[in-house]
Amino acid sequence: MPHSDEQGSLGAKELWRPSSREKTQIYDFMSKVGQKYDIPLKDYNALWQWSISEPAKFWEEIWHYTQIKAHRPYKQNLLYPANAPDENDVAIIGATEADREFISWKELRERVRQCANALKEAGLQTNDRVAGFVGNHANTVVAMLATTSIGAYWTGVSPDTGVHAVLERLKQIEPKILFADHASLYNGKVHGSHAKVREIVADLPFLEVLVVFETAKDVDFKFEGVRPANGKVVTYNDFQSAVQNESASLEFASLPPDHPVYILYSSGTTGAPKPIVHGSLGTLLQHKKEHLLHCDLRPGDRLFYFTTTTWMMWHWLVSGLASGATIVLYDGSPFRPFDVEGGNGEMAMPRLIEELQITHFGTSAKYLSVLEQAALNPSKHAHRPVSLSTLKAIFSTGSPLAPSTFEYVYASIHPDIMLGSITGGTDILSLFCSGCPILPVYKGEIQCRSLGMAVTAFDPAGNDISASGEPGDLVCTVPFPAQPVMFWPPGPKGLEKYRKSYFDVFGPNIWHHGDFVRVNPVTGGVVMLGRSDGVLKPSGVRFGSAEIYNVLLKHFADEIEDSLCVGRRREGIDSDETVVLFVKLSLASPLPCQSSRAGFSPSFAKSSVLVMFLASSILVLRSQ
């Protein structure tokens, strides 16, 4: 039920309080744990304290409650969840700006079987790598599940990523097979990918097979120039139809619990992005804990997160299958145009929620702030208003959700939902702090520190200051199963990268994440204050200054003598970080600012375009 008249500590204003705590899965879990161990668990904070003080018992109970099947690998738990829906129920809804696709559990399993057989006949083996230069559509999920069923590792990069950034990642892991979309539909326009794919394939000498998804109509995608030097190129349909044993059953490789399933990448702050390898059991256990307990996700619910395949939230979304939920994939602009209705497309996602009866909607803080600035009220829109009656929760991440946006959501989007501002990272492929269906929502606060995650705030000397309400570095003081299994490459080199990334600040037993936070000692909520390291996060897009510098060095070495890339966020003025690039132009070859900015387009992700570009013949650097 909505609340707006109560104040928590440190000025936290209560906006919502759950009305049916006893009906949630987390309440059921808390009751069962309390009875089994004969301990008084009266509220969430008591449960959280127990989960971090008794981690072995806690994770054992999570194992039993989530009903993960130990004899089944990660992908089998997704395709055959414990609370399995009817095989004819919808498992995946794939949506674009133009089309809808409804895939049953039975059809999904069959498509994975066909793709897995094709991959095996192409020579894919356990521990090989498969990459996807692909959008957020159903065939991407099928390819990932088929890949991991064999024991190979999956890595995804969105087609809007620049060629330079793609190669910085893929050249390190050397994929044997690459899936690629031949085009994408975005904001009403079809964008062909032939030029990008040609450049990518040309710089991957170890690639054996390029499989092309035909993702848009009437696109001229010629195979000339995209064939791997030592391999072949084939359409996805031909890739599957060429299988010799068409009736081969779907088999799942039996592998160790920490066998890799995903490779994601660090931001590239200190050089090339580091490949972060995540294991199957830790990922599955963590995601099911978050979905069942923190999101109250159930069979029959419809989970949607607006995400690209690069972002960690894609993997989090796909794991919703393991809870028996229907996952909704959307590939396109969140503000697709509505010519007959005018405006800037702000109603696109609310209408998608209404049309597809989405129960759990995830997005970025930036998206919600855009709706706030437009003063959008979906239920009072002049053209085809929507009630959003199926909506149970909204999740926001990528950057801190502004306090005013909290109030906007309850005033204009829906008065009685759980607004889960959440935070975690690519590094753990999950959440440190999350929503909670048995806790109130306070303005500007993430509801809680996640179960099993011993999150606290440290001052520079390594003292726990969370009880004081003072800001500090986000750290985790107890191990958790979703830690990466390794950094690529395997061996001492990757291990050293791993250690330096998280355990170099406060010692070998304290995970240092790089976020600056404040814990409310009364509500237990967490306030995100930004990054404490050099990572840039405009609009939630996480990348490092080194990626900018690498593009400058490659394309503008003669024109730009020196540069400095920084993030700016003015207290009380800016709700998001602005990326500013200062460049010192070479006197011998001055370059207009506009051409320098344009030069970033083909080499860097369009979602990471610089907001401010300042050029001068002088660049003064001072140490502080």
Regions found by a protein language model. Give the residues of each.
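Gly/Ser/Thr-rich phosphate-binding loop
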Residues: 299, 323-325, 359-362, 372-441, ...
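AMP-binding/adenylate-forming catalytic core of the ANL superfamily
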Residues: 132, 157, 161-182, 197, ...
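Conserved pre-ATP/AMP-binding loop-to-beta segment of ANL
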Residues: 88-90, 212, 227-265, 272, ...
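Conserved ATP/PPi-binding loop(s) of AMP-dependent carboxylate-activating enzymes
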Residues: 450, 463-504, 541-544
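AMP-binding/adenylate-forming catalytic domain of the ANL superfamily
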Residues: 209-214, 606-624
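Conserved AMP-binding/adenylate-forming core of the ANL superfamily
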Residues: 45-50, 91-145, 162-167, 232-241, ...
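Structural core segment of the AMP-binding/adenylate-forming
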Residues: 149-238, 364-365
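Conserved AMP-binding/adenylation subdomain of ANL enzymes
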Residues: 282-302, 310-359, 370, 374-376
